[in-house]
Amino acid sequence: MAKDKIVLAYSGGLDTSIILKWLQTERNYDVVCFTADLGQGDEVEEARVKALNTGAVAAYALDLREEFVRDYVFPMFRSSALYEGYYLLGTSIARPLIAKKMVEIAQKEGAVAVSHGATGKGNDQVRFEMTAYALQPDIVTVAPWRDWEFQGRADLEAFAHEHGIPVPTTKKDPWSTDANMLHISYEGGILEDPWAEPPAHMFKLTVAPEEAPDEAEYVEIEFLNGDAVAINGETLSPAALLDRANEIGGRHGVGRVDLVENRFVGMKSRGVYETPGGTLLYHARRAVESLTLDREVLHQRDALGPKYAELVYNGFWFAPEREALQVYMDHVAKAVTGTARLKLYKGNCIVAGRKAERSLYDKDLVSFEAGGDYNQHDAGAFIKLNALRMRVQARVEAKAGQKDKAGD
């Protein structure tokens, strides 16, 4: 009798290799492995080969770099989303794409279930499984970290030795990482102490600001209908543009963030992030928006941005409310066409200029010189009308105070 198939999100590391074998031996599945190339390096094809050598009945390695930036990162950027004011959501935005491809492979392979290596304490389990259920409501999800009996690293390594899975002999970094084209995240281990400064050798995308060049670099980023399309006059594809921005920002130490964030599952965690290219694009886009977006539209968009960020962070990318918000964000972004000039210096990303053909900025209006459509005499009536409610309240309070004194 044929076994049921399950699709595993496979990284090639020790943990997902153990999961692969555990799904075979303990759950009696034929395992189909899937590795997504989101720009994390050369190990994608190596992971595919390792999956087959470890016992997978099939293994996929898909280059998703352009799709990731075009259909996930850039739409998210249109909302100017920052989770809790700092985090550019590099891990969060990658999970729905990975889970979507898992479901598509499951449908192609006739698999009944999907599996992942996320722990039972983190956000990724939610992101993977929420996406899977949204796209295939009857899919079975298997989360080994929530199900198996292993009590610690020693048990995992014993299982690996029993089943011929190589266990690295080199000392592991005392933190975990997740990398893609948008960022690298670091958490756990020595970083669990929120007072401990991350070691200098941990960072991979950015130089230390104090070791960055002593001379500032200027970079121009051009936007068309809300998306970055060119750097320093060179038109690039979404993925190539983000790569270029990462390279430029990284050599100046731009884009490091260290924060304690609130996980969806209820606990606080400390995360350290490198997002050099995303940081450049964020500040450049805000600069162009300052010229091209109406005040009330900009303020309304910014009021909705934190909610959008929360939905992405919590795993609701395919939820109807996120999709509805996206329609609004895309409509607003149509006006964002122009160029920003940034000055990069020792970890700082400073807006040094912005221009747009359809700019709402009118130099004549803001000039201190006489003339133009703005009559300064009108300001008095404007102020008085806007102060009306406060004047009424002050009179009421003054009258009430007089009564209180009379009562004394």
Swiss-Prot record:
It is found in: Cytoplasm. L-aspartate binds at T119, N123, D124. The keyword Disulfide bond does not apply. It comes from the Bacteria. GO terms for biological process: argininosuccinate metabolic process; L-arginine biosynthetic process; urea cycle. Transmembrane segments: none annotated. Keywords: Amino-acid biosynthesis, Arginine biosynthesis, ATP-binding, Cytoplasm, Ligase, Nucleotide-binding. ATP binds at A9, Y10, S11, G12, G13, L14, D15, T16, S17, A36, G117. This is Argininosuccinate synthase. It catalyses: L-citrulline + L-aspartate + ATP = 2-(N(omega)-L-arginino)succinate + AMP + diphosphate + H(+). It comes from Deinococcus deserti (strain DSM 17065 / CIP 109153 / LMG 22923 / VCD115). NCBIfam families: argG, PRK00509.1. Belongs to the argininosuccinate synthase family. Type 1 subfamily. Pathway: Amino-acid biosynthesis; L-arginine biosynthesis; L-arginine from L-ornithine and carbamoyl phosphate: step 2/3. One of its GO terms (cellular component) is cytoplasm. L-citrulline binds at Y87, S92, N123, R127, S176, S185, E261, Y273. Its EC number is 6.3.4.5.
